[in-house]
Amino acid sequence: TVSVISGASGSGKSSLIKLLNGVIPQFVNADIKGDIIVDDDDISQKDVAARSDFISTVFQNPKSQFYSINTTDEIVFALENRNLPKDEIVDTVKEYTEILGTKKLLDRDIFKLSGGEKQLVAITAVACMKQKVYIFDEPSASLDIDAIKRLKSAIKTLKELGKIIVIVEHRLYYLKDI
């Protein structure tokens, strides 16, 4: 399932993302009324850590969430933090870089990548987590047309894998046939 959220600046798109991934209310003080249901599960009372078991977010500027300068190190970072066995990490990275067509981005300097390549590294990193829900905040921002095509392909692939994808976006043209 792919859901697209679009709206004017200040309409609450970023707030919705923060509600879904738990930043609100854990790190941003806010009064919340009602429930937040994701895939028939009320996540309203779950903290960021609990939500990270099934929700991953790729921010508009992926380099703001990078922890390493090497792309492979970046992709395996979260898997290592979950104490997965090394052979499982290697197999997962191999599987998802093949599925997403990002194998050529392994073992590269993140600072030498284009904006689109950085976005694909971030998507590969979260895809390797095998989450149920992926949230993409303005994923096409500052990408050229070729990078948008690769982004679209990655989103289609995640959809085909049965993932729930929430996209906050202003550029809607590339999402029409996903």
Task: State each model region's role.
Residues 35-50:
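ABC ATPase NBD Q-loop/coupling interface
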Residues 21:
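Helix-to-loop junction immediately C-terminal to a conserved catalytic motif
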Residues 87-105:
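Conserved ABC ATPase "signature" region
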Residues 134-137:
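Catalytic Walker B motif of ABC-type/P-loop ATPase nucleotide-binding domains
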Residues 169-170:
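H-loop/switch region of ABC-family ATPase nucleotide-binding domains
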Residues 126-127:
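ABC ATPase C-loop
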